[in-house]
Amino acid sequence: MLFNSVLRQPQLGVLRNGWSSQYPLQSLLTGYQCSGNDEHTSYGETGVPVPPFGCTFSSAPNMEHVLAVANEEGFVRLYNTESQSFRKKCFKEWMAHWNAVFDLAWVPGELKLVTAAGDQTAKFWDVKAGELIGTCKGHQCSLKSVAFSKFEKAVFCTGGRDGNIMVWDTRCNKKDGFYRQVNQISGAHNTSDKQTPSKPKKKQNSKGLAPSVDFQQSVTVVLFQDENTLVSAGAVDGIIKVWDLRKNYTAYRQEPIASKSFLYPGSSTRKLGYSSLILDSTGSTLFANCTDDNIYMFNMTGLKTSPVAIFNGHQNSTFYVKSSLSPDDQFLVSGSSDEAAYIWKVSTPWQPPTVLLGHSQEVTSVCWCPSDFTKIATCSDDNTLKIWRLNRGLEEKPGGDKLSTVGWASQKKKESRPGLVTVTSSQSTPAKAPRAKCNPSNSSPSSAACAPSCAGDLPLPSNTPTFSIKTSPAKARSPINRRGSVSSVSPKPPSSFKMSIRNWVTRTPSSSPPITPPASETKIMSPRKALIPVSQKSSQAEACSESRNRVKRRLDSSCLESVKQKCVKSCNCVTELDGQVENLHLDLCCLAGNQEDLSKDSLGPTKSSKIEGAGTSISEPPSPISPYASESCGTLPLPLRPCGEGSEMVGKENSSPENKNWLLAMAAKRKAENPSPRSPSSQTPNSRRQSGKKLPSPVTITPSSMRKICTYFHRKSQEDFCGPEHSTEL
C-alpha cells in the first residue's frame, strides 16, 4: 500500500509538458515474477482446458483487484488478485454465451460488465447480483470488440466482422427483450476499390435498419476518446479512423466519411490491420498495435497523422494480441506471438524492451492493473492466465521455502542490424583469385597452362570467373609473341564466335620441337584472316617433316592433364596447327579412301558422324560452305605417305587463290569421261579429291563403279514393273 501511495502522489502535482512528474521505475521491470499460485488454467464446460481471449481489471471503488477473464467456451470468471495467500482465487464463474467471448468491458465505476461474443450478441451483466440485465442484438457476424465511454456509464460501442460499428444506450427501452443500436456506421473500413461512385440511398428509419454485411472488411477494435468521438480500426484497410458521433450515420446509407484518418505508416507492400487500440489517461496519445510487428504512437490533438514513435521487438501475427498502459502512462505492455510479453518505456521507444517469459504459446490479451503498478495479467494460448508481481523478497511460505516460479522477466539485448554485422577475417570466405591454370574438373574446355594467353578465343568454363585483360593487337596475332608470353599474362576471357581449335593443341611427348619461321616470313595478320596462312608454298618444305608428327595429336582430357603437369614456362609447346598440317591431314583421308572400294566410300559421311569428336580434335569445325571438313578424317590408324605432290593440294577452307583451278580441271575431265549428264549429288567427296592429285594406281571412274543413292533402297524385280503379258513372253 505504501508503494501505491507513493506512485499516486505525483499524479496530484502539476503536469510538466503534458506528463506528470515520474519516478525512475524502469529498473524495477526486471523484478516481475509469476509464482505457481498466480498461474490459473482456463477450463471449458466439460473440464477441458481452453484458451482465454480477454482479461480486464475492474474500476469499481475498492474492487480494483477483481480481474474478469473470458475464454473460448463462453465462460466468464472473476479472480481476486489482491494477494497470493488467498486459496480461492476464482470466486465466481458463469457461462455468459454459448460461443466464444472475444472481448469484455467493465462499466466505469460499477460492478457491471458487457461481453461481446461470437453468437452475434453483446450481453449486459450485473456481476454483484449475478444476473443478466439485457442483450444487445443487431450484428450479423461475430463481435470482436466492445468499449465503454468514461463519461457515460450507459453508452458503449461494439465492432464486428460484418464491418459495422454500433453504438448502444442501455437507458433506452428494450424492444421485444433486446437492446437496439442508437447509431450505426456501416462499412466503416471498406476499401476504396470501387470505380463507380456510390449512389445515395433513400432515408430509412433507424429503428428498422438492417445492417450491411461485409465479411472482408472486419472491424477489429473500437474505442471511445470522449463522449462524442469514437476511434476504430479494421483488419485489412490499414487505416485508423476517428468518427464524430454527433453525426447520425444511420440517416443515409452511404459510404461513411470519418472526421480524421491515420493512414498506414509502415513499409509493408500490402495494407495491414490493427489488433489493439489504447489511449493514455489524457486521451491525447493513441497506441495502435499493428500486425506488421510494430506499435505506432499517434498524437490525437495535432494536425499531423504520422506516428511520433514506433515500438518494435515483439511479433504480432494474429488479431488477438492486445496492449495496455501502466497506471502512470510510463510503460507500455503488449502480448506477442513468440510466447512472451514485452514492456517498453514510452519516453524511450528505441531502447530494448523488458521481456516476460513463462508462457509456452502466443500471449494474447494483457492488462496492467490501473490501481496497482506491481500487477500485470497475461493470457496465453497455452490455456493459462498468469498474474505477474514485483518480487519484493516477501513471497515465502511459513516453512521458509520459496514459492515455485513459473514466470520471470529479463532485459532484451540490442540486436545488431543485419547490414552492420562485422565478420572477422577468420570467418570470412576468401575471394576467388584469378586462375591462370585450367582445372581438370571443369565441365567445359579451357586452355592449358602453357597455351597462348591471347591468341584465339576459347569457351569460358562454367565455374571460372570472368577477367578482362587487354593486350596490343600486334602481340596477340604474332606467332613469336604468342609463344614467348605464355606465363606473363593470365588468360583473356574468350568469346565463342572467335573460337579456334588451334589454341587447344598441346605438345605430346613424342612430338618434335616447333619450327619457328624466319622473321622475314612472319607477318601480322588482319583480324578476319588470323587463321589463314599467307605464304604456304614458302613454308611447305620446312613444315612437311613436322606435320607427320602433328597429325597424330589428339585433344584427349587425360592427355591435357598429363601435359599440363609437366609443362613449365620454358617449354616449347606447339600452340597452333599450321595450314600445311591441315592439308596433309586431308591427303591422308583421301589416301585411306582410295584403298577401299568406291562403293563403300559412299558411306563415308555416315561413318564420320559417329566419330565426329575425334575428327574435330585436329581441324576446325566445318563451315556450311566446305563439306570436306566433315569427312571421315578421324579414322585411325592411317598410313603416312611421303610428302610429295599430293601435299600441294590445299583445302577450300584455306582460301588460297591457286586452289580454284583443280575444280575446273576435275569438271572438264568428268565431261570427257562421262558424256551423259550426272547429278552433282552422285559425286562422292572422295571422288572430288582424287581429281586434284596424282595417285600411285589411278582408278578409272565409270558409271558402273559409282553407286547412286537409289541403290541403297530395295529394288523391285521386273515382274513388279511388267504386266502378265510381258512375264509370259520372257
From Swiss-Prot:
Metabolic or biological pathway: Protein modification; protein ubiquitination
GO molecular function per UniProt: protein-macromolecule adaptor activity
Gene3D superfamilies: YVTN repeat-like/Quinoprotein amine dehydrogenase
Effect upon mutating D457A: Increases protein stability, but no effect on interaction with FBXO11 and polyubiquitination. Delays cell migration
Region (Disordered) location: 188-210, 399-443, 465-498, 599-631, 644-703
Annotated Gene Ontology cellular component terms: centrosome; chromosome; Cul4-RING E3 ubiquitin ligase complex; Cul4A-RING E3 ubiquitin ligase complex; Cul4B-RING E3 ubiquitin ligase complex; cytosol; nuclear membrane; nucleolus
Effect of F467A: No effect on interaction with FBXO11
PROSITE patterns hit by this protein: WD_REPEATS_1, WD_REPEATS_2, WD_REPEATS_REGION
UniProt keywords, alphabetically: Acetylation, Biological rhythms, Chromosome, Cytoplasm, Cytoskeleton, DNA damage, DNA replication, Membrane, Nucleus, Phosphoprotein, Repeat, Ubl conjugation, Ubl conjugation pathway, WD repeat
GO BP terms: DNA damage response; DNA replication; mitotic G2 DNA damage checkpoint signaling; positive regulation of G2/M transition of mitotic cell cycle; positive regulation of protein catabolic process; proteasome-mediated ubiquitin-dependent protein catabolic process; protein monoubiquitination; protein polyubiquitination
Reported modifications of this chain: Ubiquitinated by the anaphase promoting complex/cyclosome (APC/C). Autoubiquitinated through 'Lys-48'-polyubiquitin chains in a PCNA-independent reaction, allowing proteasomal turnover. Polyubiquitinated by SCF(FBXO11) when not phosphorylated, leading to its degradation. A tight regulation of the polyubiquitination by SCF(FBXO11) is involved in the control of different processes such as TGF-beta signaling, cell cycle progression and exit. Phosphorylated at Thr-464 by CDK1/Cyclin-B and CDK2/Cyclin-A but not by CDK2/Cyclin-E, MAPK1 or PLK1. Phosphorylation at Thr-464 inhibits the interaction with FBXO11 and decreases upon cell cycle exit induced by TGF-beta or serum starvation.
Keyword RNA-binding attached: no
Record's bilayer topology term: Peripheral membrane protein
Induction details: Induced by TGF-beta, the up-regulation is immediate and transient.
Result when mutating R246A: Blocks association with DDB1 and ubiquitination by DCX(DTL). No effect on ubiquitination by SCF(FBXO11)
Motif DDB1-binding motif: where in chain: 168-171, 243-246
Protein's UniProt name: Denticleless protein homolog
Organism: Homo sapiens (Human)
Originating gene: DTL
